[in-house]
């Protein structure tokens, strides 16, 4: 789905990408081949040569789900990642996400099925869903204290 939505900038998906030591497994990573905003800006500002996407098939996201995704982010994976979940998340999730932004400058962009459906519709109409994901980043960044 992310290849369809952002295939012009996200290349070479690796499913269940493992660290060399084999201790961590990431659901999907993409090479960030962007040369335009916002993906290029994120590559430079946050070091995302590879974009991490974690997927959770749960009713509600827990702190551990968010913490796990944030733990993958850092010097080697960059400081922006995506957590895809089935359901809409509430204000409690936004508060938890702000902890990662405030304390570690890690941005976990949470998307759900409805976001993805809306973005697919945009793409089908010939529009670019990049603005929608940039809005998620901006709201998280501006919501930080």
Show which residues each predicted segment covers:
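Catalytic core segments in nucleotide and nucleic-acid processing enzymes
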Residues: 1-145
């Amino acid at each position: 789905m992310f290849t369809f939505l952002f295939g012009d900038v996200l290349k070479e998906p690796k499913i269940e990408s493992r660290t060399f030591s084999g201790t961590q497994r990431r659901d999907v990573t993409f090479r960030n081949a962007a040369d335009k905003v916002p993906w290029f800006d994120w590559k430079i500002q946050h070091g995302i040569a590879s974009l991490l996407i974690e997927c959770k098939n749960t009713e509600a996201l827990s702190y551990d789900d968010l913490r796990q995704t944030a733990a993958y982010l850092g010097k080697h994976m960059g400081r922006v990642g995506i957590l895809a979940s089935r359901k809409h998340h509430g204000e409690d999730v936004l508060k938890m996400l702000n902890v990662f932004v405030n304390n570690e400058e890690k941005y976990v962009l949470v998307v759900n099925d409805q976001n993805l459906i809306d973005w697919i519709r945009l793409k089908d109409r010939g529009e670019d869903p990049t603005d929608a994901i940039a809005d998620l980043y901006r709201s998280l960044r501006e919501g930080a204290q």
